[in-house]
Amino acid sequence: MFNYERPKHFIQSQNPCGSRLQPPGPETSSFSSQTKQSSIIIQPRQCTEQRFSASSTLSSHITMSSSAFPASPKQHAGSNPGQRVTTTYNQSPASFLSSILPSQPDYNSSKIPSAMDSNYQQSSAGQPINAKPSQTANAKPIPRTPDHEIQGSKEALIQDLERKLKCKDTLLHNGNQRLTYEEKMARRLLGPQNAAAVFQAQDDSGAQDSQQHNSEHARLQVPTSQVRSRSTSRGDVNDQDAIQEKFYPPRFIQVPENMSIDEGRFCRMDFKVSGLPAPDVSWYLNGRTVQSDDLHKMIVSEKGLHSLIFEVVRASDAGAYACVAKNRAGEATFTVQLDVLAKEHKRAPMFIYKPQSKKVLEGDSVKLECQISAIPPPKLFWKRNNEMVQFNTDRISLYQDNTGRVTLLIKDVNKKDAGWYTVSAVNEAGVTTCNTRLDVTARPNQTLPAPKQLRVRPTFSKYLALNGKGLNVKQAFNPEGEFQRLAAQSGLYESEEL
C-alpha cells in the first residue's frame, strides 16, 4: 500500500517563500546536523467526472540525495549554542511538491532554472546559505511554477494511486473481474452480450470524459507523466453504436379449424402466436370488432395459449372470424368459420279437435278421428280399456298425415271392440292424452206382416156393353147400382130419412 509519509531525504533545507532568516551574529546559529522528519498529508479528492487509464503513472522519480543539501556553517565563536535558525512552514502541499520536483522547461518559452537550484545557490567564496548576503551581491529572483501546473501534477498522482488501489480490489484471485450489482442485473435482464455492449458504451463515454479532462490540463510540467486511455478486452465500441433491440413479426404457431356448433352450446377457439415484442390480438366478426362481454371472453394462459370463449353460442355468432396479431415488426391474420346450428323450437302436443264417442251396430265400420299439433311430430299410442290396440291388421288400421290428422279405422265391428279408447301424443316437449267411448249394439231380428188380399172387379163387361150398345151410356154406367155396391163394401148404408 502506498505510504504518504515523507522520506527523510525529502526534507527541505530552506523555504523560498515563507522562511525568514535572522540576521547573523552572536545570537544566530546554523542548522543542526540532525535532520528533521516531517510528513505530507494529502487528502485525495473524489473526482466523479474524470477517470484516468489503468496504466498512467508518474515516471519521474522524486528523489534527492542528502548531498544536495549544503553543509551547515560553523557556529560563530560568540554565538549562543541554544539558539537556532527557525523556518516557518506556511506553504501548501502542492507548492511543496512543486518545490521538490525537478523543474521542466516550458514548452512555449525558454528553459527556466530549477527551483531547487535557485533555492540552494552557493557563493563562490563559500558563504553559507543561511548567512545574509552581502550588499554588493546582486539578488537573483526565484522563479515559481504556476499553481495550475502544480495542481494538475498532484491530481494526476492522486488519480494514479487511486486507480492502482481500485484495480487490485476489483480483480479476484483467479484473475477474473468482479461483477457489480448493476452488471449482474444487466446480464440477467439483457443477456451477457447486450449487457457487455451497454457497459462498453459507458466505458467509452468515460474515456471521452477523461480525454476531455486531459486536454484541459495538457500543459502539465511533469514530462514523464503520460495519461493513456483504458483498454478493454471487449474492444472499442463507438458511442453511435447503440443497442439495437431485435423485433420479430407475429407468427401463428397454432390456429383453430372451422367448426359447427349447436345453438346454446359452449364453444372455444384456441391458438398460439409468437413475436417480439408480444403482439396485441384482436378479433373481428364479418368486419366488426368482437368486444369482450359476459358471453364472449378473450383469455391468455401462462403458456401463451390464446382463447376466444363463447359461453352460450347464439345464432348471431355465426360467421367468419378474423384474428389479427400486431406488434412493431408487423402483423399476421388468420380466419375461421363458425356455423351455428339453429336450435329447433319444440312444442308440446296439443289437440286441435278430439275424437268423438260413437255408437255403432255389429258388423258396421267406424272411424275415430282427431287432429294433433306438435313440434317435432309426436308419437301416437292407442289403448282400449288400458290395453294397447294392435294396428296393421285386417280389421284395424291407423292413418296419419302431415297436418296432424289421425284416423283409427275399425272394420266389421263386434262386441269386443266396444269400450274406452285413449289416444296419447308424446314428443320431447311434452305429452297429451284424450279419451273417447265406442258402443256396439246388436242388430235386431224384424218379422214382416202378411200381404193384404185385394179384390179386383173386372170391368170388361162394362166396356163390352158400351161397345155393344153403342152410344147408350146410361145403360152402360148405372150410377145407382154402382153406388149401392160401393156402399155395401164400405159398410155404409143409406139412411131412410134422407
Curated annotation (Swiss-Prot):
GO terms for cellular component: actin cytoskeleton; axon; neuronal cell body; plasma membrane; sarcolemma; Z disc. Residues 215-498 are annotated as: Necessary for interaction with ACTA1. Its main location: membrane. Signal peptide: none annotated. Expressed in skeletal muscle (at protein level). Expressed in skeletal muscle, heart, bone marrow and thyroid gland. Residues 1-46, 64-151, 202-241 are annotated as: Disordered. Residues 250-335, 349-441 form the Ig-like C2-type domain. It is found in: Cell membrane, Sarcolemma; Cytoplasm, Cytoskeleton; Cytoplasm, Myofibril, Sarcomere, Z line. The keyword Kinase does not apply. Residues 79-150 are annotated as: Necessary for interaction with ACTN1. It holds the Pfam family I-set. Residues 29-43, 202-212 have a biased composition (Low complexity). GO terms for molecular function: actin binding; alpha-actinin binding; axon guidance receptor activity; structural constituent of muscle. Keywords: Actin-binding, Cell membrane, Cytoplasm, Cytoskeleton, Disease variant, Immunoglobulin domain, Limb-girdle muscular dystrophy, Membrane, Methylation, Muscle protein, Myofibrillar myopathy, Repeat. The keyword Lyase does not apply. The modification Omega-N-methylarginine is found at R20. Gene3D superfamilies: Immunoglobulins. GO terms for biological process: homophilic cell adhesion via plasma membrane adhesion molecules; muscle contraction; synapse organization. Residues 77-138, 222-235 have a biased composition (Polar residues). Residues 215-493 are annotated as: Necessary for interaction with FLNC. Component of a complex of multiple actin cross-linking proteins. Involved in the control of myofibril assembly and stability at the Z lines in muscle cells. It is linked to Myopathy, myofibrillar, 3: A form of myofibrillar myopathy, a group of chronic neuromuscular disorders characterized at ultrastructural level by disintegration of the sarcomeric Z disk and myofibrils, and replacement of the normal myofibrillar markings by small dense granules, or larger hyaline masses, or amorphous material. MFM3 is characterized by progressive skeletal muscle weakness greater distally than proximally, tight heel cords, hyporeflexia, cardiomyopathy and peripheral neuropathy in some patients. Belongs to the myotilin/palladin family. Homodimer. Interacts with ACTA1, ACTN1, FLNA, FLNB, FLNC and MYOZ2. Interacts with the C-terminal region of MYOZ1. This is Myotilin. It comes from Homo sapiens. The gene is MYOT.
